[in-house]
Regions:
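Glycine-rich segments within core transmembrane alpha-helices of 12-TM secondary carriers
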Residues: 22-40, 226-234
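Helix-to-loop junctions at the C-terminal end of transmembrane segments
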Residues: 44, 142-155, 242
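C-terminal membrane-cytosol helix-exit motif in multi-pass small-molecule transporters
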Residues: 59-78, 262
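Cytoplasmic membrane-interface "Motif A"-like loop-to-helix N-cap segments
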Residues: 152-164
Length: 262
């Protein structure tokens, strides 16, 4: 899904409008996710929901929407024919490298930031869910602002700001262990960390600017694969490090973010 989603965005949205338009799409996605999560939280006990019911209803609604779109919009014409095979081009090496580092950063957030909240502060499922809802609401508000900032200051400055911010956030995660900082600081870092995901749109629009139009679809597929290479080994490797020193995991994450900054 994400490969097709990113490919179509970069093909159809004009370069000058891309940062703002993609940011609105991100805000809309966060808003819909917020509503879905909130409905589950509010109706789970009231309606006696189960995982099976939630997945069946969600999957059924998605299938109905897909069928509607299939018949309502039978064909979209892309402005540029796309290469139908995978490609690797040397001139996209920086984009590939940044995608790999972005994947590593995502794994650290998904696996270890949440684990910290549970292990260190004993967060329950409902508390983690509430924290996630807060991050979604924040993205609804902040994502359009980030799109405007990227449009004004450019991708390079936006990405440098993201990587510098991530270094600070990961070091602060380590400080939770080294200095015994409390739950409010940790929760705030979790929200800020998640907000930084919105700055990933700068990497998308950077690629849109440097890519040959016919390379967008195949490179989106390659980049998505590169992004997930870290998911193969990083959680296991850092998981062993976590057993020795949880703070060291976040120090290593800060080092990775600093590599992207450089």
């Amino acid at each position: 899904y994400e490969t097709v989603n990113q490919s179509l965005q970069l093909q159809w949205i004009a370069k000058k409008d891309a940062p703002q338009t993609i940011s609105w799409l991100m805000a809309m996605g966060a808003a819909v996710t917020f509503v879905a999560y909130a409905l589950i939280v509010l109706t789970w006990d009231w309606l006696g929901l189960t995982y099976n019911i939630v997945y069946m209803v969600s999957g059924g609604l998605t299938a109905l929407i897909a069928l509607f779109c299939l018949f309502a919009y039978p064909q979209f014409e892309a402005p540029h024919p796309q290469i139908k095979t995978f490609i690797l081009r040397r001139r996209y090496w920086l984009y590939y490298a940044l995608q790999f580092m972005a994947g590593a950063r995502r794994q650290i957030f998904v696996v270890f930031a949440g684990f910290m909240m549970v292990e260190r502060f004993g967060f329950r499922v409902d508390q983690i869910t509430s924290l996630y809802l807060l991050t979604l609401f924040s993205n609804v508000v902040i994502a359009p602002v980030i799109g405007k900032v990227v449009g004004v200051f450019g991708e390079r400055r936006a990405l440098l700001f993201e990587y510098a911010g991530l270094v600070a956030v990961f070091l602060a995660y380590g400080g939770v262990y080294y200095f015994g900082w409390g739950v409010m600081i940790a929760a705030g870092l979790y929200v800020v960390d998640h907000i930084f995901f919105a700055l990933a749109l700068a990497l998308k629009t950077y690629f849109q600017k440097i890519a040959d139009p016919q390379d967008i679809a195949p490179t989106a597929a390659v980049a998505f694969t590169i992004n997930h290479i870290a998911a193969v080994f990083l959680p296991a490797g850092l998981g062993y490090l976590w057993l020795v020193s949880p703070a060291a995991v976040f120090i290593a994450a800060a080092a990775m973010a600093s590599v992207s900054f450089v």
